[in-house]
């Protein structure tokens, strides 16, 4: 993380590039290889051969100060969802993206209770951190609903991140 321009100079291009490589290029690389394998599957009764579910972040839409690299990398994942869904339609492969908000993760668990309470206070309803089971439930719904394709779904309790 880093600001675009700080008293120490411009944001490190190496750090920006690393975030893009890990989050965006890493996601695309796994996606393209999964699509190659799925294209060999026998189609089901509706012609579907599989569904790819990517993970972005609400930071793709509401990036905070110091999150340019992270937001750009997650925004790229959101941005490639529809065109890749269109690309893979002829192969019977659906593509969806989940953009989670603030979830109970090992990283959040390392934060103080005060910081966690502050994060929860930003979430309109339900005013609590996301449970990983919510993500799993949404992924299952995406898999089971054959008409979901080419869309990014925010899973965030209506949170909109403040600039800071």
Predicted regions: what they are:
Residues 62-68, 91:
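Active-site loop immediately N-terminal to the catalytic Tyr-X3-Lys motif
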Residues 57:
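Residue(s) in the substrate-gating loop at a strand-loop-helix junction
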Residues 95, 99-110:
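Short, flexible catalytic-loop segment of classical short-chain dehydrogenase/reductase
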Residues 1-17, 40-46, 66-69, 109:
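Conserved mid-core segment of classical short-chain dehydrogenase/reductases
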Residues 36, 85-87:
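Alpha-helical segment proximal to the catalytic Tyr-Lys
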Residues 9-29, 53, 77:
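Catalytic Tyr-X3-Lys loop
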Residues 31, 73:
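Active-site helix of classical SDR
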Residues 97, 118-157:
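C-terminal helical subdomain
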